[in-house]
Curated annotation (Swiss-Prot):
Protein name, as recorded: Spermidine/putrescine import ATP-binding protein PotA
Gene: potA
Cited CDD domains: ABC_PotA_N
Species this protein is from: Shigella sonnei (strain Ss046)
Gene Ontology cellular-component annotations: ATP-binding cassette (ABC) transporter complex
Quaternary data: The complex is composed of two ATP-binding proteins (PotA), two transmembrane proteins (PotB and PotC) and a solute-binding protein (PotD).
Reaction(s) catalysed (UniProt annotation): ATP + H2O + polyamine-[polyamine-binding protein]Side 1 = ADP + phosphate + polyamineSide 2 + [polyamine-binding protein]Side 1
Length: 378
């Protein structure tokens, strides 16, 4: 959201590595992916993001060759791999369970794929140790999986996946089993490792924060379809529809009705009972219903007294939560709607905290809002 600034768009010079064209997949007669087209570029960290059952893991398994498409084509480096068996694709997968062999040492787990490929014996030790160095586990080579922490097991699984030097690494919710602190650490390590290796990563998650943190590009999915495809900043600041807006982070959705268009950019509208100017980049008519979307951190609040004449939306503080860097307040508007406001904490301001039931005026910087048509009344 926010200022009309250039977002961190992907460079257009990236070359395609994987192309999915017209992909359709059914399970037990139920269509889970009706028609999907997706291009994954060389060297990027792409995340498939969506709620449970949206089809993201199915897409991953189709790329890996663990499921077969009902129709459509999958290309890897301009080669049609639609019907190529999984073991013959230069693609490796790290599963949520890691799937390490418990009776083997870390070294043997990582070496397993090389032995299966009949790699010359003289190459195995240097390649395994190189992979373990990449994930900072070279001193753990002789340990068994049960002697490792969850984060270390995850890194062994990644080392085992990259030792074969795949063109593409697929990760299926592979951080979800870790505790919060370790998950944050592994997010940073995984992104740094991807940059170091230069391998294309495709990561599946339902965790929005994880996707925003790690990805070069995010593909938001729902019911087997792509809802939006863009950089993390584009997805967060310029959601294309209400589903994406509501799924990615906290957001306030205000109901609005068009009064009149003022100029090419601005529209006068009734927003939750108050007249405001909003920026609308599509054609509207008087009386048309709209949604005005604003992140909690994009709202500006001011304490007012009963006799103050204030601009903006008027409400009362019903909850306030100190979060360290921020103060989060829930403000109830005069029409009963609850609004979330997030302010950066100012320890030098003794009046920064708000009392419960304090009357507030809510405003925002013009053009920071995202305005969408009402999908029910188009």
């Amino acid at each position: 959201m926010g200022q009309s600034k250039k977002l961190n768009k992907q460079p257009s010079s990236l070359s395609p590595l994987v192309q999915l064209a017209g992909i359709r997949k059914c399970f037990d007669g139920k269509e889970v992916i009706p028609q999907l087209d997706l291009t994954i570029n060389n060297g990027e960290f792409l995340t498939l993001l969506g709620p449970s059952g949206c089809g993201k893991t199915t897409v991953l398994r189709l790329i890996a060759g663990l499921e077969t498409v009902d129709s459509g084509r999958i290309m890897l480096d301009n080669e049609d791999i639609t019907h190529v068996p999984a073991e013959n694709r230069y693609v490796n997968t790290v599963f949520q369970s890691y799937a390490l062999f418990p009776h083997m040492t870390v070294f043997e787990n990582v070496a397993f794929g090389l032995r299966m490929q009949k790699t010359p014996a003289a190459e195995i030790t240097p390649r395994v140790m190189e992979a373990l160095r990449m994930v900072q586990l070279e001193t753990f080579a002789q340990r068994k999986p049960h002697q490792l922490s969850g984060g270390q097991q995850q890194r062994v699984a990644i080392a085992r996946a990259v030792v074969n030097k795949p063109r593409l690494l697929l990760l299926d919710e592979s951080l979800s089993a870790l505790d919060y602190k370790l998950r944050k650490q592994m997010q940073n390590e995984l992104k740094a490792l991807q940059r170091k290796l230069g391998i294309t990563f495709v990561f599946v998650t339902h965790d929005q924060e994880e996707a925003l943190t790690m990805s070069d590009r995010i593909v938001v999915m729902r019911e087997g379809r792509i809802e939006q495809d863009g950089t993390p900043r584009e997805i967060y600041e310029e959601p294309k529809n209400l589903f994406v807006a509501g799924f990615i982070g906290e957001i306030n959705m205000f109901n609005a009705t068009v009064i009149e268009r003022l100029d090419e950019q601005r529209v006068r509208a009734n927003v939750e009972g108050r007249e405001c100017n909003i920026y609308v980049n599509f054609a509207v008519e008087p009386g048309q219903k709209l949604h005005v979307l604003l992140r909690p951190e994009d709202l500006r609040v001011e304490e007012i007294n009963d006799d103050n004449h204030a601009e903006g939306l008027i409400g009362y503080v019903r909850e306030r939560n100190y979060k360290g860097m921020t103060l989060e307040s829930v403000v109830e508007l005069e029409n009963g709607k609850m609004v979330m406001v997030s302010e950066f904490f100012n320890e030098d301001d003794p009046d920064f905290d708000h009392s419960l039931d304090q009357k507030m005026a809510i405003n925002w910087v013009e053009s920071w809002e995202v305005v969408l048509a009402d999908e029910e009344h188009k």
